[in-house]
Regions:
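Helix-coil boundary/capping segments in enzymes
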Residues: 1-320
Length: 320
């Protein structure tokens, strides 16, 4: 952080009952849980303080490249634009430093300061120049849907820089997040992202920005048939026909899970738009450290399709 921004630095605070297993981030007057950590992994690997340990584990898991997503930003972290800018700038520079020793093994998604739209393009440019291969977004941002015209400068910049927007299971709206505060995350995080996909496609964002690629990350893929069916009905009411290969035509990729009904989903998604991840370092219902190996070994779908999910499709999404 810049010296002038250090007053915005996140603080770690403990539980009032003294429970050492529970602590929180305090950022801009808001408490956010500092949890969801897979403690069975070595700390050096989990927090990337020792890349050799993490790379060794990646080799065991047959993972060539990891694309790193943030944890703290799944919540709406800042109320004030100046805090948002300080957090995003410092995170992006921290990540650039971390991955610098192993650029062939680690890529990352740059976090844009969306309360400071006039500063977004420069952060995306910094990310692109320092190993970022995507732009992090949440299902709702700045109390707006992602199809809102407010985000058009971001989409234009991302398209020009060949960076996909990667809509991760998360919520950047304080009002929506806090309404679902005690809810486990299905409505708060996952449905916000499904809604983001629907609004982006329904409101014609892929057509408005023909260079833009979109990733829908860490919300399973089970929802795809329902969302596409709903979009098709809405298009018909407007006298339009939804294309038969919606995801491919709109340049949308979606992460699946190994326990998804892949045969059914592939009928709607096609073979060229599914990817998969491990949620490495986390401990929630999307975490699946052996996901790549499991998908390959279980053989639920044909081997050429598995190769696309594990290799061809992520290369296309992230321009690797």
């Amino acid at each position: 952080m810049l010296e002038s921004e250090r007053r915005f630095k996140p603080k770690i605070v403990g539980a009032t009952d003294g429970d050492p297993s529970v602590d929180f981030w305090l950022i801009d007057g808001r408490l956010m849980p500092r949890s969801n950590v897979e403690k069975q992994l070595p700390r050096g690997a989990r927090e990337m303080s020792d890349l050799s340990i993490r790379i060794g584990h990646m080799d065991e898991l047959n993972i060539d490249v990891q694309v790193i997503y943030p944890t703290i930003f799944i919540f709406p972290t800042a109320r004030r634009p100046e805090v948002d800018l300080a957090l995003c700038r410092s995170y992006n520079r921290w990540m650039a430093d971390i991955v610098k020793p192993a650029p062939d093994r680690f890529r990352w998604v740059v976090v844009p300061p969306l309360l400071n739209m006039e500063r977004v393009a420069e952060e995306l440019k910094f990310g692109k120049e320092h190993g970022a291969c995507g732009v992090y977004m949440r299902g709702l941002e700045a109390d707006r849907r992602l199809s809102d015209g407010y985000f058009f400068p971001l989409y234009d910049a991302a398209g020009r820089l060949d960076l996909p927007i990667c809509v991760h299971s998360a919520n950047g709206s304080i009002a929506s997040h806090d309404f679902f505060l005690d809810e486990p995350g299905f409505c708060k995080f996952k449905l916000a992202v499904v809604g983001a996909f629907h609004s982006l496609v329904n409101d014609g964002i892929p057509e408005r920005f023909p260079q833009l690629r979109i990733g829908i990350i860490e919300v399973s893929a089970q929802w795809i048939p329902y969302a596409i069916h709903d979009l098709a009905r809405r298009h018909l009411r407007r006298g339009k026909q939804l294309s038969k290969n919606v995801l491919k035509d709109k340049r949308v990729w979606v992460t699946c899970q190994t326990d998804d009904d892949l045969d059914y989903i592939l009928g709607y998604a096609g073979e060229d738009t599914l990817v998969i991840g491990t949620d490495y370092g986390h401990a929630d219902n999307a975490s699946e450290i052996e996901a790549l190996r499991k998908l390959r070994d279980e053989g639920k779908v044909a081997a050429p399709v598995i190769k696309k999910i594990l290799d061809d499709n992520p290369r296309a999404l992230y321009a690797l």
